[in-house]
């Protein structure tokens, strides 16, 4: 996360942040739980060897990154818009892909022999809360 924030600063993308309301933090916590249950719990293919596990982690990490509305947006009165020309959108989507791979690693690491989802949920919550803290520090939280 520090690398992402530093990268945004170096690339001049930190001023392109979206502003969020202070109470959005509850959605960020709920999203961590729900996304881990779906992506690291339900969708991942296990029990068919490491190649299948790694391949499914890569494919579902891509899906995870693309599911976040940085390269696209949907508004009821405007419909779907694609945003492929934004450096910020590509940067953030790329980091979401990397974070997703990290969450898979946390779930399937040797120190987690039961492959519990709790460590990946905790890692995801920490990442989301740190993102919230950075946005607050940078002035992108409306109180």
Model segments located where?
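Catalytic phosphate/metal-binding cores of nucleic-acid and nucleotide-processing enzymes, i.e., regions
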Residues: 8-14
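Loop-to-helix transition at the N-terminal end of transmembrane alpha-helices
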Residues: 14-24
């Amino acid at each position: 996360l520090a690398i992402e924030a530093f990268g945004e600063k170096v690339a001049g993308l930190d001023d392109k942040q979206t502003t969020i309301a202070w109470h959005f933090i509850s959605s960020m916590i709920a999203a961590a739980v729900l996304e881990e249950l779906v992506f690291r719990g339900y969708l991942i293919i296990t029990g068919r060897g490491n190649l299948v596990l790694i391949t499914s982690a890569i494919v579902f990490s891509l899906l995870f990154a693309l599911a976040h509305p940085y390269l696209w947006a949907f508004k009821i009165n405007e419909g779907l818009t694609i945003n492929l020309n934004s450096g910020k959108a590509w940067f953030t989507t790329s980091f979401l892909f990397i974070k997703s791979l990290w969450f898979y690693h946390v779930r399937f690491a040797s120190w987690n022999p039961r492959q519990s989802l709790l460590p990946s949920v905790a890692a995801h919550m920490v990442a989301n809360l740190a993102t919230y803290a950075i946005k607050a520090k940078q002035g992108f939280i409306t109180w």
